[in-house]
Design a protein with these regions (language model features):
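Extended, solvent-exposed, turn-rich assembly/linker loops in the middle of proteins
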Residues: 123-193
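Extended, compositionally biased alpha-helical segments that mediate assembly or anchoring
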Residues: 238-275
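Short helix/loop capping segments that flank catalytic or ligand/cofactor-binding pockets
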Residues: 53-56, 169-172, 258-260
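Short acidic, glycine/tyrosine-flanked loop/strand segments centered on an H-E-D-like triad
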Residues: 69-91
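Glycine/small-residue-rich hydrophobic helix-like segments
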Residues: 191-240
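N-terminal "assembly arms/tails" that initiate or stabilize quaternary assembly
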Residues: 1-74, 265-273
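Alpha-helical scaffold segments that mediate packing/assembly in large oligomeric complexes
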Residues: 86-152, 267-275
Length: 275
């Protein structure tokens, strides 16, 4: 077995990992503000307050809104997803096998991306309803109202991420699952990855925090409320280790997340205790 790896193969494998990460690795990265190619260990997301328009008299100065300018710092950390491969030469000739290994690394990095975003969403203290019930229409409408009261834009960039238990509970809500309310094109049965309802893209996710008392933290938020930053795209390093007679494939990525505007996040605490 060769102990050196052709660099063209390494670059091709790296591209496959990156493509898999972009396509399937993270469910939530596209739902938040995202920065790429960040230089250094941190970056800043700007936040601007609300402005109020006013009149002015003839020849008077235009009134100044005195907007409050604030920012949130996002700190990046390095994350790795590596594995040992005894027969790397097989990857060069077996496309299916190579894609399996590439996907494994990409999905691991994608899960970490979602974990970072969820960790920031969990900082929300804007709760809709109590934590003694599951996800029902009443709790959904209370969260919807809370977003409106905070003037969160209803501009097509709202997202709601819920657990699979809550997704099945929503399927029992006729306003969510019936074509009479949402139209045939928006029925959740056409695809379980996401569904639009109440001007919001609803996404089921298996990685949401399950806290004490089997309470799942589900979140409804605006894209601008959470920031994600990446220092670089997915990188891959392949090295030979003679003591193991194997190659080590390491996929790595520098990234971080931060909550920018807590008012843009409403959390629905949902009880998953068996009835």
């Amino acid at each position: 077995m060769a102990t050196t790896i052709d660099q063209a193969f390494v670059r091709q494998f790296e591209r496959e990992v990156h493509a898999s990460y972009q396509r399937m690795g993270s469910k939530l990265r596209q739902t938040v503000r995202s920065k790429g190619d960040v230089k250094g260990a941190s970056t800043v997301f700007q936040k601007v307050g609300k402005g109020i328009a006013a009149t002015k008299s003839r020849n008077a100065q235009v009134p100044v809104m005195d907007l409050v300018h604030d920012n949130e710092t996002c700190y990046l950390e390095d994350y790795y997803a590596g594995d040992w491969i005894d027969k790397l030469d097989e990857l060069k000739t077996n496309i299916d096998e190579r894609q399996v290994i590439a996907n494994a690394g990409a999905y691991a990095l994608g899960r970490k991306t979602d974990e970072l975003i969820i960790r920031e969403l969990d900082k929300s203290t804007n709760y809709a309803g109590d934590d003694a019930t599951g996800l029902d229409l009443e709790k959904v409408l209370e969260a919807f109202e809370a977003l409106g009261e905070k003037d969160v834009p209803d501009d097509g960039q709202r997202y709601a991420v819920v657990g699979w238990k809550q997704w099945t509970e929503l399927l029992a809500v006729k306003e969510f699952a019936s074509a009479d309310y949402v139209g045939a094109d928006e029925l959740p049965f056409r695809g379980t990855q996401a569904k639009k309802w109440l001007g919001t893209m609803w996404i089921p996710h298996s990685g949401l925090t399950l806290g004490a008392g089997d309470v799942r933290l589900c979140h409804w938020y605006h894209k601008s409320a959470i920031g994600h930053a990446a220092g670089s795209d997915v990188e891959t390093d392949i090295s030979w280790h003679g003591d193991r007679a194997a190659h080590f494939v390491n996929n790595m990525m520098s990234q971080g997340a931060v909550i920018i505007d807590p008012d843009g996040v409403v959390t629905m605490r949902c009880d998953e205790t068996p009835a």
